[in-house]
Amino acid sequence: MKKFQLFSILSYFVALFLLPMAFASGDDNSTESYGTVIGIDLGTTYSCVAVMKNGRVEIIANDQGNRITPSYVAFTEDERLVGEAAKNQAPSNPENTIFDIKRLIGRKFDEKTMAKDIKSFPFHIVNDKNRPLVEVNVGGKKKKFTPEEISAMILSKMKQTAEAYLGKPVTHAVVTVPAYFNDAQRQATKDAGTIAGLNVIRIVNEPTAAAIAYGLDKTDTEKHIVVYDLGGGTFDVSLLSIDNGVFEVLATSGDTHLGGEDFDNRVINYLARTYNRKNNVDVTKDLKAMGKLKREVEKAKRTLSSQKSVRIEIESFFNGQDFSETLSRAKFEEINMDLFKKTLKPVEQVLKDSNLKKSEIDDIVLVGGSTRIPKVQELLESFFGKKASKGINPDEAVAYGAAVQAGVLSGEEGSDNIVLLDVIPLTLGIETTGGVMTKLIGRNTPIPTRKSQIFSTAVDNQNTVLIQVYEGERTLTKDNNLLGKFDLRGIPPAPRGVPQIEVTFEVDANGVLTVSAVDKSGKGKPEKLVIKNDKGRLSEEDIERMVKEAEEFAEEDKILKERIEARNTLENYAYSLKGQFDDDEQLGGKVDPEDKQAVLDAVEDVAEWLEIHGEDASKEEFEDQRQKLDAVVHPITQKLYSEGAGDADEEDDDYFDDEADEL
């Protein structure tokens, strides 16, 4: 059946559906089952989790005591690592250590910037039906993961961090995304949450969340602020009005592919070229050497925020040769100046879109670790002619705001007077005759929103129309991003231009789009599309499978942890026995020489067993060895106590069981 495109025939009507509060109110019955809702900043390079309790926001430290966690996942021969542990071993395991996954989520393999990303990653990216998948070695076998699955592993780490702090399970979360993330990237982020065992009840734009962190205590007079959010991999600018707890986004712009990683890569490439030229080699082919260089360049960049120069030293960098170069702040700025200046374009755009002058901006809020770069601050402050605000922590502000949003949704104390009115970042529309982009909802429209428009058929007796949905600012659809498409069938035969087909776009508070179409004659079957599968999104079956696999990984992690704990318990016990029975001032001087030797021999047997089987033994085997050791020791200590030796009855026995986590 031939399909034809649409053309607009009537002036459209608007049914603007804007709730007075973009947040769910605290007394909404639907919030009762949420429990504690956490706020997660799922960053390109670092992630952060926070919670609102008793009117206060707590940034939650991870198991290493750090308030931000590297967005890294790694696979070794026998375990999966997430966070610091994954990042620390990255230089020695580059092909199986995944980072910057946010640059892949919700994207197609054939996108323009994808080839550049793939070239810069030490791990393998493969094409699966135009979806980028990460291929790594897991337990000696090749395994492919979607970006959603890797992101889910990071979200799961954040979930576990929150649960350890709260002492109870967490099932609901607010997760932030760059304001300029498109529909596919937002949906993919929600899917990642589902795989991680989290119901993502709201997606919040990162600069908007940061604005909450900035303006929560500023309720006196209306302010216009610009949030300049330059993170590890993405860049957003939002212009907001803040007035008595109402946060209204007036305009947003940005670049989902610009951030600190790009600055690092420029320096890495510069230093690699310099090293190659001096030594007549090609170090870029050595992934481990490049991993070491990446690690040191990131450190150097941070140092240059407070120093004018830094010495980069790497022992045994390549072919046994050391690396030693000085990097000055001036050189760093020279290498990246075009990227720094590029960040001012979106700033100009939000001023233009909101019809505000520079002089009408009350404050500039810096968010994201890359805003610590002195030249970035200098360019921005020069543009506005005023100093930027440094009153909030750029690494934690987004998670802070997400936690406040979470508090509102769950009805937490102190959150009832907060209202957030966000906007969509890109124009939404459909393709009509001639490949024209007919716009239904313009960019920077407040959400949630709903808009309808009447279209008709292009030829006589047309009974099916193809509705193609796009996002973007260009006149022709070929220059914009296709979100999805569907057919409206069963239109009664009629001359061209007679049927009335109502197309409705609805954007929810998460910025997620639903499109519906209906023949106004009432004879055609209504059709509805939640934009998803046409962009390579995960199907429900995919998500269910990945949830199951994530649970299996969690079970494997649990088994591994228990095995390690059992081994540590055995080693600690044997070590304590050896120390006690080797020392004549302790138990060694209180037992018969034969008994002493029996214990020391048993300890030696355990040490030899650990040497042979320690890497492969199961939890049960470690526990069995402990019991065998007990069988030797217990009768001896019992005999000692029955003879009156030892002043504290079972104190010595308790001592052997005294364990502490080893660093």
Swiss-Prot record:
UniProt binding sites for ATP: 43-46, 102, 232-234, 298-305, 369-372
Keyword set includes Hydrolase: yes
Listed name of the protein: Endoplasmic reticulum chaperone BiP
Primary location class: endoplasmic reticulum
Feature: compositional bias, Acidic residues: 646-663
Nucleotide-binding recorded as keyword: yes
GO molecular function terms attached to this record: ATP binding; ATP hydrolysis activity; ATP-dependent protein folding chaperone; heat shock protein binding; protein folding chaperone; unfolded protein binding
The entry's keywords: ATP-binding, Chaperone, Endoplasmic reticulum, Glycoprotein, Hydrolase, Nucleotide-binding, Signal, Stress response
Function: Probably plays a role in facilitating the assembly of multimeric protein complexes inside the ER. Is required for secretory polypeptide translocation. May physically associate with SEC63 protein in the endoplasmic reticulum and this interaction may be regulated by ATP hydrolysis.
InterPro entries noted in UniProt: ATPase_NBD (IPR043129), BIP_NBD (IPR042050), Heat_shock_70_CS (IPR018181), HSP70_C_sf (IPR029048), HSP70_peptide-bd_sf (IPR029047), Hsp_70_fam (IPR013126)
Segments of this protein annotated with the region Nucleotide-binding (NBD): 131-285
This enzyme's EC code(s): 3.6.4.10
Similarity section: Belongs to the heat shock protein 70 family.
Substrates-to-products reaction catalysed: ATP + H2O = ADP + phosphate + H(+)
Record gene name: bip1
NCBIfam families assigned: PRK00290.1 (NF001413)
Top-level enzyme category: hydrolase
Region Disordered: start-end pairs: 639-663
UniProt PTM comment: Partially N-glycosylated.
GO annotations of cellular component type: cortical endoplasmic reticulum lumen; cytoplasm; endoplasmic reticulum; endoplasmic reticulum chaperone complex; endoplasmic reticulum lumen; membrane; nuclear membrane; nucleus
Residue positions of motif Prevents secretion from ER: 660-663
Pfam families reported in the protein's UniProt record: HSP70
GO-annotated biological processes: chaperone cofactor-dependent protein refolding; endoplasmic reticulum unfolded protein response; ERAD pathway; IRE1-mediated unfolded protein response; protein refolding
Signal peptide per UniProt: 1-24
